[in-house]
Amino acid sequence: MTDSKGYAVNDLVWAKMKGFSPWPGRISEPPAELRRITVKKNIPVRCIFFFGSNNYAWIEETQIKPYQEFKEKLLSSCKSAGFKEAVQQIEEFIASPENFQHLFASEQDNRPDPDVEFNKLREGGTESGEETTVNNTSTPAALESVETTPVTAKKSAAKKKVRASLPIKLHVDKVVVFRSVAASTTKARAIGNKAKAAAALNDTSSPKRKRKILNDTAGDVSSLDLDTFSPVRRNVPVSHLLNRPTVARPATPEIDMTSVSNALQSRNIQASNLKFGFLGLGIMGCGMVKNLLNSGHSVVVWNRTATKCRKFQEAGAEVADTPSDVIEMTDVTFSCVADPQVAKELVFGNCGVMSANLVGKGYVEMTGVDPETSHDIAEQIIAKGGRYLEAQIQGSKNQAEEGTLIILAAGERLLFEECQTCFEAISRNSFYMGDVGNATKMNLVLQMISGVMLAGIAEGLALADRAGLQQKDVLEVLELTSMSSELVMQKGNAIIKGEFPPQQALKHMQKDLKLALNMAEGLEQPLPITAASNEVYKHAKRLGYGSHDSSAVYVRARF
């Protein structure tokens, strides 16, 4: 069906959303999540599929123009890379529409005809003589109403009149007839409402009034004559507005156990005679264990997902069933997991570190934790006769595989010396910083600086794109200035490519910012810029980018 302006499903158009240039799109059937969005009453809108970003949105008809007719005029309205990609995609769609059908899978082309469902709604209400209401969670609220006139020969004309006033055809999922089984107070309210409706009809001096079936506010249920009802969600889902151009997380390639990094080959490492354990084979852990094995160390590994241990077992590592088994089988155990909570679970949980005999055993915590967590673990390890060292790592996945990390250690000095051959295999420098807690504080300060700087890079490149500048040119100029660094160039290139391969997960960066803010809170040190950056990372994580690289914070800054 076409609307008053002649638009039909599959028509190609230019659609303008507030804050954006006119964008090439296609008139579409709204997907399920979009039909739940409340739109303004009596304003004709169309569901638009935007090319390039592959999202849907309701757009007012006044902001829609035919694609071919306005093509020459609007092609120069925006110079961003995303716009050019969208134009290229719509031209490819024109040439080969069958190649794009997978993008429209969320559209429900086989929905029942809205006119038929609307007629069923009206006929069911008048024949039963009882109140009817719509229980519809898949369409915008407050867009449908029925006249409270008696059933006469004018019924068909009234239907046409009501349907003509609707800006959008609705898919009525269910019609519920509420029987007279409620308490007397509910019946009285229903009777009172009907009496008011009848009085309004008898008043010939006023025009016919329409009674809304669903309230326009989508939150007030007091006007509905319901015996029972489910709570109405006040927060209407608007996730599609935030789910603008996103990318699927790139698959993490399996680590190549046969290759040896140039940095490791250039070092003359004499492997220690001690036996080392390693808990956690994540993004950073895999690279470190690989270098320990390639440098000749004897290693026992454990990971929550046992399948990750196979490659290391083939390369010469032993595999233990539980963390406590690793402690029993080794002299020194390294732990490198996701966050402080997981680190505590490994120590205090079932079959954890504390379940083993710790007398004379060394435990090295490499997880990014706060000073309080490190102190808690240290106290328990030492209380059972063990030795403790915190060894915080600075670097990325590539640096872990190359063996060029930075190690910040604090705790028992003798244990630090015993681990030197391991630190030589996985890092280019290791620093001993004294008492437990000093290394974690230093690490949080460095992570805070890195996170704030990365958020600034993301916002700068987002502004450049919005201003019509080429992000590649911005990065080339930036490389020539004193602001240039390896971090800036790596993250900048990742943003331009839009791939965000995980070097350091965004959720881990946000975790470190949160821990830095907690530490500052205890010291009464204000960190307003860090706090603002933390909110940006939290939003990006909320959009589903927590497991992507931290450079994916650009998605939040740009969209």
UniProtKB/Swiss-Prot annotation:
The keyword Nucleotide-binding does not apply. Belongs to the HIBADH-related family. NP60 subfamily. Nucleosome-destabilizing factor that is recruited to genes during transcriptional activation and colocalizes with a subset of trimethylated 'Lys-36' histone H3 (H3K36me3)-enriched regions. Residues 267-559 are annotated as: Dehydrogenase domain. PANTHER family: CYTOKINE-LIKE NUCLEAR FACTOR N-PAC (PTHR43580:SF2), OXIDOREDUCTASE GLYR1-RELATED (PTHR43580). One of its GO terms (molecular function) is oxidoreductase activity. InterPro entries: 3-OH-isobutyrate_DH-rel_CS, 6-PGluconate_DH-like_C_sf, 6PGD_dom2, 6PGDH_NADP-bd, GLYR1_PWWP, HIBADH-like_NADP-bd, HIBADH-related_NP60_sf, NAD(P)-bd_dom_sf. It comes from the Eukaryota. Binds to mononucleosomes. This is Cytokine-like nuclear factor N-PAC. Keywords: Chromosome. Its main location: nucleus.
